[in-house]
Amino acid sequence: MARYLGPKAKLSRREGTDLFLKSARRAISDKAKFDSKPGQHGRTSGTRTSDFGLQLREKQKVKRMYGVLEKQFRRYFEEADRRKGNTGANLLFILESRLDNVVYRMGFGSTRAEARQLVSHKAITVNGNSVNIPSYMVKTGDVIAVRDKSKKQTRVTEALELAKQVGLPAWVDVNADKGEGVFKKVPDRDEFAADVNESLIVELYSR
């Protein structure tokens, strides 16, 4: 299955929430109206979505948010289920540990898609070694850096400037001048993705 290359705001409207796919970290109201689904008439009133429909929608939302396709998402779920603790939370921890997501969280890319491009184009190093695999799992203490020749790219400097304005999450420590950061820890569940109900995804895969 190929990645979706159409309008990004349309996906956010379909899920009813900002997936942070389009441009950097602007407010939802600045991007599009997410209270109606795409299409001529938008959301149909008076209809009730089935439990299965709600579960499927939540899975689609998280897949699109992190830019992961079904086969890989299923593997992540199976890994999360094998780990100790809450399966749903474990799934989100795995997604948050992807290199492309960490690059995004550190402010080197204004969207996860842009961060994924930086990784794929060999603009990112992990502990001094070039890594061009977006799904690479970052570990606590890993140092993520933008390679010297890429630091002055407009998209990188603009993303860092924006990150400076809106702030960075507590689980990363970034030196913007050096273009590098440390992944301090896997975030606690209450530190991110407040609008995600991962239990629905667990219910879906447990059918």
From Swiss-Prot:
| Keyword annotations | Ribonucleoprotein, Ribosomal protein, RNA-binding, rRNA-binding
- The protein depicted here goes by the name Small ribosomal subunit protein uS4
| Molecular-function annotations in GO | rRNA binding; structural constituent of ribosome
> Region (Disordered) spans which residues?
31-53
Q: Function of this protein? A: One of the primary rRNA binding proteins, it binds directly to 16S rRNA where it nucleates assembly of the body of the 30S subunit.
The cross-references to InterPro entries, in alphabetical order and at most eight, read:
Ribosomal_uS4 (IPR022801), Ribosomal_uS4_bac-type (IPR005709), Ribosomal_uS4_CS (IPR018079), Ribosomal_uS4_N (IPR001912), S4_RNA-bd (IPR002942), S4_RNA-bd_sf (IPR036986)
Q: What biological-process GO terms show up in the record?
A: ribosomal small subunit biogenesis; translation
| Classification via HAMAP family | Ribosomal_uS4_B
Q: Name one GO cellular component term.
A: small ribosomal subunit
- In the UniProt record, the gene name given for this protein reads rpsD
Q: Does the keyword rRNA-binding apply?
A: yes
Report domain S4 RNA-binding positions. 97-158
Q: Name one Pfam family in it.
A: Ribosomal_S4
Q: Which family does it belong to?
A: Belongs to the universal ribosomal protein uS4 family.
Disulfide pairings: none
Task: Cite the NCBIfam families for this sequence.
Answer: PRK05327.1 (NF003717), rpsD_bact (TIGR01017)
Origin species, per record, is Polaromonas sp. (strain JS666 / ATCC BAA-500)
Q: Subunit arrangement? A: Part of the 30S ribosomal subunit. Contacts protein S5. The interaction surface between S4 and S5 is involved in control of translational fidelity.
Locate the compositionally biased regions of type Polar residues. 42-52
